[in-house]
Amino acid sequence: MVVKKIRRSCPIGFTLVELLVAIGIIAILMGLLLPAVQMAREAARRTSCGSQMRQLGLAVANYESAKGRLPPGYAGLTASRRFNTWITTLLPYLEQQAVYDQMLADYVTTPDPFDNPGVHRGFGHTLPLLLCPSSTTGFEPATDLTGYPSVAFTTYLGVNGQDFTTRDGVFYLDSKTRMAEIRDGLSNTIMIGERPPSTDRWFGWWYAGYGQLGTSSLDSLMGVRERNIGSRGNSICGPGPFSFGNGHPEFQCSSLHYWSQHPGGAQWVASVSRWN
């Protein structure tokens, strides 16, 4: 008599419990990994932001080397190119010669860009170099502001001193600051700082900045303790002065002081083109 042995087959695959345990472990690992990835990405954006600011500082240094002075903060009503900002003056030193030449041609047509903004094509020309990657606003030109076909923005503002009335900083109306005139020391004097454009998009214009009372304050320039005349919806903020602090693009009062959207606060360029 032959006895046949029955071979039992072993089950292949996961049980439901094993599958749930594996999913749980993967979820825990992802939960630990994602914040680290996000932190690494934000650190990269912050570093990129600092690199852009260093380029601006280097452009200022090259301009000073060529002209013997720093670029004017902005041009007033008596200038041939009214409301021209320190950024537009630096365009040839930022590898933006074509944009600069276009600006010169448009100023020949209309010496005051606010008389006919549609003529000045640079108003709506977005330059990625001028926008910190951490910012959530300003990357698209505004096309719905009354009287302006298109307006582009900057995260980086020149420091005009304590506030727009004192003109004791590096950049201000028709300024011709020389390095030798910076008495507090080049490494101790901040020249450029950060402030993201506001969501109402009335401040932070890089091409031509009227700002407060035609001083370009809050557009391409701002003081470290800026005052407020209550223009463009800022009347709720009071007269100030406004110093460094946390901000948000949707808060109207955040347009009145330096701040940033990346960890560690706003970054600065000193007058020796050093990034801090």
Model-based region annotation:
Residues 1-9:
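N-terminal secretory signal peptides that target proteins for export/translocation
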Residues 11-45, 55:
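N-terminal single-pass transmembrane signal-anchor helix
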Residues 2, 28, 32, 43-276:
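Surface-exposed loop/linker segments characteristic of extracytoplasmic
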